[in-house]
Swiss-Prot record:
Cofactor(s) named in the record: FMN
Co-factor binding comment: Binds 1 FMN per subunit.
UniProt EC number: 1.6.5.-, 1.7.1.17
Keyword annotations of the record: Flavoprotein, FMN, NAD, Oxidoreductase
Species of origin: Staphylococcus aureus (strain Mu3 / ATCC 700698)
UniProt protein name: FMN-dependent NADH:quinone oxidoreductase
Annotated FMN binding sites: S17, N18, S19, M99, W100, N101, L102, S143, R144, G145, G146
Pfam families assigned: Flavodoxin_2
Residues annotated as signal peptide: none
Subunit structure: Homodimer.
Role: Quinone reductase that provides resistance to thiol-specific stress caused by electrophilic quinones.
Family listed: Belongs to the azoreductase type 1 family.
Gene: azoR
Source species taxonomy: Bacteria, Bacillati, Bacillota, Bacilli, Bacillales
Record Gene3D superfamilies: 3.40.50.360
Length: 208
């Protein structure tokens, strides 16, 4: 039995969001074909994720030295530890994001910072950093109103590129994508683009 974290970063649901519609289709089909697997939904817009700030950095330093943390430091450090342990307990991750300002919503970066921890998801060695998530799988479902996979705007895309890069850095050997794009550039194709993405999501869910 595998554990899947379904990690969404959109303020709207599948009735409004193309990425959420594809994500919903993926998860429902996945559960039909993998009934014994556990699926946990993490809505990053409804989840408290401490940013790495002065309290966190000071708290980590105090922990290393065996010192007492303040209440704020303890609360933030403990919450980040819980997020990390939940992430480590899973086998597969499905990220659902829109493209915002060429990337993704800031809650995604906060979450990635929470799980990118030396000694847990990667380590330093004589050969350089080594990823430790060598038995995990990732799917990224992202919607983009324009076209960024190819063409003159391709170099501007920094959302999927960043997520792919950080997951490679963390050692993840399998990274797949479902990209939904062009519905704002060509509004007359919106329904066709959405239907294609849902179909692709349902197909991938059977083998992921």
């Amino acid at each position: 039995m595998a554990k899947v974290l379904y990690i969404t970063a959109h303020p709207f649901n599948e009735l409004v969001s193309n990425s959420m519609a594809a994500g919903k289709a993926f998860i429902e089909t996945y559960q039909q074909h993998h009934p014994d697997d556990e699926v946990k939904h993490i809505d990053l817009f409804e989840t408290y994720i401490p940013v790495i700030d002065k309290d966190v950095l000071t708290g980590w330093g105090k922990m290393s030295n065996g010192e007492t943390l303040t209440d704020d430091e303890q609360m933030k450090v403990s919450r980040l530890s819980d997020i990390l342990e939940e992430f480590l307990s899973a086998d597969k991750y499905v990220f659902v994001t829109p493209m915002w300002n060429l990337s993704f919503p800031p809650v995604v970066k906060a979450y990635i910072d929470a799980i990118s921890i030396a000694g847990k998801t990667f380590k330093y060695s004589a050969e350089g950093p080594q990823g430790l998530l060598t038995d995990k799988k990732v799917l990224h479902i992202q919607s983009r109103g324009g076209y960024y996979t190819e063409g003159p705007a391709a170099d501007f895309e920094m959302g999927d590129r960043y997520l792919r890069t950080i997951m490679t850095f963390l050692g993840v050997p399998s990274y797949e994508t479902i990209i939904i794009e062009g519905h704002n550039a060509e509004p007359h194709k919106t329904e066709e683009i959405k239907a294609t993405s849902i179909n692709n999501a349902e197909k991938l869910a059977t083998t992921f």
